[in-house]
Design a protein with these regions (language model features):
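Short beta-strand to alpha-helix junction loop
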Residues: 158-169, 212-232, 382-388
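Helical element adjacent to the flavin cofactor pocket in flavoenzyme catalytic cores
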Residues: 206-257
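N-terminal glycine-rich phosphate/pyrophosphate-binding loop and immediately adjacent elements
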Residues: 3-135
Length: 390
């Protein structure tokens, strides 16, 4: 019996992961990437001696990656080195007004207590609840539930936590902490989920456990180490990877996939998995097979996009760390410009990353590599003049 032939669209982390599991289970797997290099948004840029992560830069939830490699009787350390950052990150609230989050709960509790008397006790209780939510979200929902029906989410454990699904992160944080600085630090992790803290259920405080409880890590050569590790594992399992393969459309006969069209050429397959955005994937299907209309997608609130800058400095940059959050402007005003009234932000918050602070080889000697990110709404007018302004 011949192996079923599966095409996977895109080469981001979900695609690279799926490819490995499918190949392990005996399928013939080919990953198709539209760009000239693999990794999706986690590609790497090298130029004039500088190395930049082009997308993801926060290595959180290390246990998830350890489990991934262990599922194939491998160890993460077989593929790349990992270092825990201290401080994990530094938050700027204004000139000479900063808070650094260090690498253990005991140190973080001292930082909180210094900022707000009594907050360390409250924080410990908050993080313990966040840990409980993390255990449920990752070990139960992620690893054990097949994700076929919403009914799976209704069980004795989730019922006991029903209030955390009704309330929101902002409400819970502001009920427990008075310091504006501490509130911002505790609300920021849910930005990784693409939503405002006021619109995110309190259950998602498990991101705070990922932050404070598990810590912030960094692969030696950047996030692309993880991409290379997953590809190396995939190749050992028989996965094929093809770049410069932009899928034009998916061909079906009845309700059965027959293959895909790429640059005017047809390639047959038995199954297709898409790691691309849902809306884009639907646009590849004939209209009669699409579940949602363009009008439907037009009414949806999209997760933020971002304006990115990759900057090579010919000097060392003082007073910054590996990860830096600049919260020196109004958080809510910027969020409104992203979600409520989409427009280019007038006074944006931003994030700055300098991997050369941890691994000097990512920049020439005496130099610094800077990655700068401004969260913005999607589908904004984009011109060189606007980019120059920022």
């Amino acid at each position: 019996m011949s192996k079923k032939n599966i095409f996977i669209i895109g080469s981001g982390f979900s695609s690279l992961s799926a490819a490995c599991y499918l190949a392990k289970n005996g399928y013939k797997v080919t990953v198709l990437e539209k760009n000239s290099s693999l990794g999706g948004r986690a590609r790497q840029l090298k130029k004039q001696g500088f190395t930049f992560d082009m997308g993801p830069s926060w290595y959180w939830m290390p246990d998830v990656f350890e489990k991934f490699f262990s599922d194939f009787n491998r160890r993460r350390s077989d593929y790349f080195e990992l270092k825990k950052l201290n401080p994990a990150y530094k938050v700027f609230f204004g000139n000479n007004d900063t808070i650094s989050i260090e690498d253990s709960m005991e140190k973080i509790k001292k930082t909180f207590e210094k900022e707000e008397a009594g907050s360390s006790v409250v924080l410990e209780s908050f993080i313990n609840e966040a840990k409980s939510n993390y255990e449920l979200a990752v070990k139960k929902m992620l690893y054990e539930m097949p994700g076929i029906s919403p009914i799976e989410l209704v069980n004795s454990q989730t019922i006991r936590k029903v209030f955390s699904f009704i309330t929101n992160i902002r409400k819970e944080v502001r009920k427990k902490f008075k310091s504006h600085r501490l509130r911002l630090i505790l609300e920021f992790p849910v930005l990784f989920l693409g939503a405002k803290s006021s619109n995110t259920p309190g259950f998602y405080n498990f991101m705070n456990f990922a932050d404070f409880g598990l810590g912030t890590w960094q692969p030696k050569n950047g996030f692309f180490d993880l991409v290379k590790g997953m590809i190396k594992l995939g190749k050992s399992l028989g996965v094929n990877y093809k770049t410069n393969m932009s899928v034009d459309s998916i061909k079906l006969k009845g309700n059965i996939v027959k293959g895909i069209n790429i640059n005017g050429k047809f390639f047959s397959c038995d199954l297709i998995i898409s790691g691309a955005d849902y809306a884009h994937t639907e646009s590849l299907l004939p209209k009669i097979y699409r579940q949602y209309s363009q009008k439907y997608w037009g009414k949806k609130t999209w997760a933020p996009s971002s304006l990115l800058f990759y900057v090579g400095f010919d000097t060392k940059i003082p007073k910054v760390e590996h990860h830096n959050l600049f919260f020196d402007t109004n958080f809510d005003d910027h969020a409104q410009d992203i979600y409520d009234e989409p427009k280019w932000p007038s006074d944006p918050l931003f994030y700055a990353n300098f991997t050369s602070k941890t691994f000097t080889k990512t920049a020439p000697d005496g130099y610094e590599n800077g990655f700068f990110l401004i969260p913005i709404a999607t589908n904004l007018k984009d011109t060189n003049e606007i980019r120059d302004h920022y």
